[in-house]
Amino acid sequence: MTKKKSEEDFEETEELVVEVADTEDLTIDDLPGVGPATAEKLREAGFDDLMAIGVMTPADLADQAELGEAVSARIINGARKMASIGGFLSGMDILEKRREVLKLTSGCQSIDELLGGGFETKSITELYGEFGSGKTQFSHQLAVNAMLPLKEGGLSDEDDPAHVFFIDTEDTFRPERIRQMAAAKGLNPDVVLERCHVARAYNSAHQMLLVDEVKKAASGINVKMIVVDSVISHFRAEFVGRGMLANRQQKLNRHLKELKQLSDVNNAVVLICNQVMSKPDAMWGDPTKAVGGHIISHASAFRIYLRKAKAGRRIARLVDSPNLPEGEAVFSVIEDGLTD
C-alpha cells in the first residue's frame, strides 16, 4: 500500500499565506491543508507544535511521521511561515528572542560567573575531561538544580514542573547521588527522582532513537534538560579506524543536530559529557584533547574543560563561547554536591 491514500487529507496549495495576530495560539491543526489524519500522524511522531515541525528537514519529517517527502516539505514551509521561522530578523528582534533564554545555576558562584549567570537553555554545553574530573557529578547536580524554582536559578515553574532526561551510555546514573544532592537543596528527593527520566543506551543507533523518545515525551511534560553521558562512547567503540571516520562523524552530526532542535523547541539545557584523548606528539602544554573532532566543537555553544587540581579540588575552564571570554573557576565535589 502506498502512502498516497493515507495522505489524501492533505490539500494541495500553491502558496501558504497566513495572517495571524498571535502565533502562540496556533496549533498544527491550523496548518493549511493538514487534515485530521495527517495531524494525528504528526502528533503520534511527537510533533505537536509549529516550532517542532518548522525546524525539521523534509526527509526527517517524512521518515518520522510516515509522510511523503513532498507533503512534508509543504507542511514545514507552512509551519515556518506561521511561526516566523527561518527568515531574516533585525538585531533588535534577535535580542528580544534572547530574552527567552534561561540560565540554570550550577550551585557554584564562581562557575555561574564564568558562564555569565549559568548554563544557557537553547544551547548545547559540552563538558570534557579525564575520568574523575567531575563530568558525571556536574550532570547530576544540574539535573537537581533544574528542579529549583526559576527565582532560585532553576528551570521549574510552579504550575509546570521541570523534567530532566538522561541518555546514559556508560551506566553512570546514580539515584542515590540525586537523593543526596536534592536533600541538600531542600527538595523532596523522591519527587526529584520521579522527574528524572533515565534510559540506558546500548549502542549508537539506540542512543539516537532515544532522542526521538524524548521528543515524544515533551508533548506531555515540561522537558527542561537533556543529559547525554557520554555522547561519544558508543560512536567511538563502533566506528573504528580511519575508513569509518566519515560515517561516524555524519551520524554524530545528525545526533547533535537533533539534540539542538530539542533544546530550541523546549527552551531546554542540553548537556553532553565527552571523553578525552592524549596527543602523544604534544611538545609542550596540556596534551589532553576532546574526542569527536570538529563536529562536536562546532555543535557546542559552550565548551568546558574539567581537570583535577590539588587537595581534591577541580578546575572548570571555559574554552569556547559565542559571547564570553575564556576563563577558569575552581570548585569542589562534596557529599552535598558541587561547591566553591
Question: Can you say where each PLM-predicted feature lies in the sequence?
Answer:
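The Walker A/P-loop phosphate-binding site
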Residues: 38-41, 78-191
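Phosphate-binding/switch region of NTP-binding enzymes
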Residues: 249-253, 257-340
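Short, ordered loop/turn segments at secondary-structure junctions
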Residues: 58, 169-171, 230-232, 275-276, ...
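Long, low-complexity intrinsically disordered regulatory regions enriched in P/S/T/G and acidic residues
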Residues: 1-30
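Conserved inter-motif catalytic segment of the P-loop NTP-binding fold
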Residues: 159-244
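A short amphipathic alpha-helix within small helical-bundle interaction modules
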Residues: 28-31, 42-64
